């Protein structure tokens, strides 16, 4: 099938590449001509495990193409995916200008029936808005479909190729048949393609992300209570996770959620509720807890150093909002770095993938280490902010010899408490006993 993907950000590139992998002819379009040229030459502009191989293979086999010309991209496409940014506006609502602008441009170019699919995360009612914009600019027949993505950064290729479900919002029979055909190779093991109306589909995406964010904030609250009552959050997590009604996933406490989805989507859903005169109290609490949780580790650091961080040097392991990605959008590490710098501290950081993005954002306000151990040199303490696998089993002998003080503030609960006792560390984690 011939497909066009408008937008070559994270969602657009994963979508386009994975659709090409099953034999579709895919043209991805982006207004950034320099980026398009780079991709035409086989250079992948994002880091995502497993994507580079598929990306390069489908370019070589001439199933994946890139252009900056919208007319060229959609000319023969039967389905057009909109994978465009919907950044939060000043009031927290999603900015639909990119989506609606693309819809208008596409409408003016239509010559035959096509299916327009919103892959971006959009508020309820967006499909209706896209339809109105397009009808004002064309008399050619078309269908607008909601098909939200449920990709997890770090495992996005697997999520697309073997989805646990595909949600499609459409009441158009032709569009339904086309989407069922398109996704059939990805659901051969029986995972469902769930068809529904457009508004339910749009809300499903926001509801899913907001529920997961709620689980995270709830467990962070439990972790904070554990520290006060002398309980261990890891034991509590195991105890409640064994209940199949709750499940084991998204029960890890830490320093708050980040990334391109959860913060934006929770805020947008709360704003959508507000616009419909509904006070979504739980989501307000979820956001409040998350902001507070980002400050927890710095407060612990300040208490240890008696409130004076001026002239102190801190090593930081982890900058990305989660492991296996270079994405730093709303990363807790950025908030923690800002607080430490404002307190007069110096920082040496290491992250396997995200240092370039951080340097592009904040420049030389901090130093960037060649490896995790270089970051420890002359450091008064180590802060662990992202649970990269490389940080889970470090060379403790090298740590002992390199750190100025054997002091660790662990925002991801990576290490066994008994081991840290045996090594003679001051070890302050989240929701567990303080080792001092």
Residue ranges and their predicted role:
Residues 1-436:
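Structural/interface elements that position substrates and couple domains in central-metabolism enzymes
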